[in-house]
Amino acid sequence: VVEPLSGLGEGEMAEVVWIISEADVREMLGRSGFLYGEVLTCLLKNPVRQLCVYKIRRRVVAIREEYTKEILVRRML
């Protein structure tokens, strides 16, 4: 099942399937490590600051919550 990254909870893992953002945002997300096939772990969701923190490979990346709705993922069991 493919769903937006925003649905992932803290501690859950997923594989990036598709990014449905505009080209400039997609490029920025790609530079941050959000690429097709990458496995990531949700480390923190902070609704007050509207930030989400993910671990991708050995990197820890924070992105705006709005972008997590444009990254489609498949949960890992």
Model-derived segments and spans:
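Compact, glycine-rich, soluble single-domain proteins
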Residues: V1-L77
